[in-house]
């Protein structure tokens, strides 16, 4: 799977993750929340945001897979989705995310939606 190497999207992705302490920058959507609460009741969603940030910060955005969105119903709204596989609580977890931004020059503009999570 191709890594996230585009400089603008990489910067925006890391900027969104860097704001993990604040509401609205990493948004866990209902399907991801449902699985995470059932399978990994600890850590909290905020803690998962911190772990995602630390993982990408330590390994660079090339640890994030960038997929061209081809699925019906999504490809018209999102050109890409981004996948992260990382250890959490002794398990390898897959996170499917969407990067949303309008102003790549504003570090507080981008946000990430975590739309799915499951064992990798």
Q: Predicted regions: what is each one?
A:
Residues 1-78:
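Compact soluble domain cores
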Residues 57-111:
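Functional cores of ribonucleases/endoribonucleases
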Residues 114-120:
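Short, solvent-exposed aromatic-acidic interface loops
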């Amino acid at each position: 799977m191709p890594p996230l190497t585009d400089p603008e999207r990489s910067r925006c992705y890391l900027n969104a993750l860097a704001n993990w302490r604040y509401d609205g920058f990493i948004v866990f959507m209902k399907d991801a929340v449902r699985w995470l609460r059932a399978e990994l009741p600890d850590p909290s969603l905020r803690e998962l945001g911190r772990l995602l940030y630390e993982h990408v910060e330590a390994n660079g955005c090339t640890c994030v897979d960038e997929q061209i969105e081809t699925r019906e119903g999504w490809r018209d709204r999102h050109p890409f989705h981004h996948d992260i596989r990382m250890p959490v609580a002794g398990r390898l977890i897959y996170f499917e995310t969407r990067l949303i931004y309008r102003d790549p020059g504003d570090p507080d503009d981008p946000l990430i939606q975590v739309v799915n999570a499951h064992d990798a």
